Each structure stands twice: as structure tokens, then as C-alpha cells.
């Protein structure tokens, strides 16, 4: 700190925390250390370059579909590691800042656009809109909702809502985030962290439903599910691709992004 002439850490009885300058310093220090490791590996006799891909994403089926198709593009004999983590928006951003993942996709309600863009600008992140959409109701084809010509919030009151348990928006109370992210019109709720479990629940318990971005048709057919808009829910959501400004997209990154755009077009169709 003395040689740099800046304060990198704030010290108190509760511990030591990085200042904004400290966060930048730590981020670049990690990058330098990784580059040193890469140079050491280059001249240690292990010359085979390993292909790596890493991304943090929301629990979205069209994104998972894109990743599955992307994985088939990795040629046999390639030394490759692919990391795919489903998590909330804040953790996706932290994974980039900590240099644990190279890419991220964050999902948030349009009303929080300013909060996220301000934070990403402050943290030195590039961002690009992938999709803009309204949530649909997702339910089994034998659900009471399937028989209705039009669905309202009141129709959901006696059903069981499945929701992801960890929405998060910086600088806002959690109660406000839940109110905006999760329309709360059901007395019974099941909170899940794993996307796979939601499909098992929807297929087995026909009184369940959840709010979801558009789902690929093959997945709907596999679990006997259907989707429909709710007349009362007009909220718009965004999926945004992010990466650090000091990171250059690799060939494998662009391969995934190409599959992501294809999956979005196939799944969203005329809703785009």
C-alpha cells in the first residue's frame, strides 16, 4: 500500500475488507499469478494445451439445451474441461470477479436494469442482451390450468408454486426482490435449488406450477408439460451475457454463444 500510494484494505475490529482499489488490485494480481502458472506449465514439459470453458447461468432450460448441443462440438481427442454452474445473478457476477469463471449469464426483472448495469459498469464487466421475455406458467398437461382458456392470478391461489430459492438483487431488501421476481399468488410453495427436481415435481404433482422462461418443446414433451401466459403478469425479464472487460472471448466461447443464440431463436420463436 505504501509503495502504491493507495489504500487497498479497510481494517476494523470485524476484520479486513478490500476497498474499491483493493478489489481491482486483487483481481489483477490473480490474473498475473495465473499467467505465471501458465508460463511455468509451458516450459515444464507439459506442452499439451487444455481447452477450458466456464460459465455461470440462471436455471434456464434453453440455456442448458444450448450447452448440451455445444458439448457435442468438442472433438474426440481434445483435452477439454467444461464448467457449467447454475446459480443466481449475484453469484454469477462474483464468479467473474474472482476469476473462477470466464462467462456468465444474469437474469433479472427489467425494473432492476439500472441496478445491474450500474454495478457491472463499476465492476468492469462487459454485458450484452441475449433475450427479453415475459415469464410463462409451466404446468403438467393434466393440471387444472390446462383446461382454462385464460389464466389469472386468482386461478393460482389453490395450487402449489415451485420457485427457485435464491433470487438476489444488490442494494435492495430481499422482500422487495421476491415481490418483483416471484409473483406470490399461491399459499403453498416449494422452493428448489436444482432445476432437474422441478420437472420431476411438475410431472408427478399435477397441482404444481412455476413461472419460467420459454421451455424447449422436446423438454415439454418429455415430461408431459405445457406453458401458457398469465393475463395478469406483464413483467419483462432479461437474460444478459457478461464477461470481464479485460477478457477476450476465445474460440470455444464463441462456439457456445453461437449455440446459445440458436437455442434462443428455436425456443422463443415468434416471442422474440
Describe the role of every protein-language-model region.
Residues 214-217, 226-272:
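A late-sequence structural motif
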Residues 1-18:
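A short LG(V/I)-centered, amphipathic sequence patch enriched
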Residues 21, 25-28, 65-69, 248-260:
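Short amphipathic alpha-helical coupling segments at ligand-binding clamshell hinges
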Residues 88-89, 105-112, 140-141, 204-207, ...:
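Beta->alpha turn/N-cap motifs
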Residues 97-102, 166-226:
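Hydrophobic hinge/microswitch elements
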Residues 63-69, 113, 145, 149, ...:
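Secondary-structure junction motif
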Residues 50-116:
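Central regulatory/effector-binding core of bacterial HTH transcription factors
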Residues 119-135, 139-161:
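Flexible hinge/capping segments at coil-to-helix
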